[in-house]
Amino acid sequence: MKTYQAKESEVAREWYLIDAEGQVLGRMASEIARRLRGKHKPEYTPHVDTGDFIVVVNAEKMVLTGKKLRDKIYYHHSGYPGGLKEKTAGKMMQEKPTDVLWLAVKGMLPKNSLGRRMLRKLKVYAGNDHRHEAQCPKVLPL
């Protein structure tokens, strides 16, 4: 008997809705990454994108534990000499809370083209409104 390997065309994809209000960032991000990879499915195959679509609302109301709002620093580089920029998690949560969750999930996915394709299935919104009612996402309790 041959080992089953899923094909991209045979994978049934679901849409899930997650309410981030009161959820801890890291715990929520790890569950989102698991669902984006498809590891919760019996037909999971490491080299095939078997994951589902995830819509996250209320990203501005998620929780960072401890002193992370003050102490956690996000870095990026402009590409120019002396262009290393940094922001605290508190400032990021004020300006763009969607990026905080997006970066946390990005760090938990594979660092290759498959990981980038998985990340495109993540839709994050700061408020309660989203544009995916037509897909009828199922509410995913965490």
From Swiss-Prot:
GO BP term, pick one: negative regulation of translation
Keywords: Ribonucleoprotein, Ribosomal protein
Any one GO molecular-function label of the UniProt entry: structural constituent of ribosome
Gene Ontology CC annotations of this record: cytosolic large ribosomal subunit
NCBIfam families according to UniProt: rplM_bact
Subunit structure: Part of the 50S ribosomal subunit.
Record's protein name: Large ribosomal subunit protein uL13
Source organism (scientific name): Syntrophus aciditrophicus (strain SB)
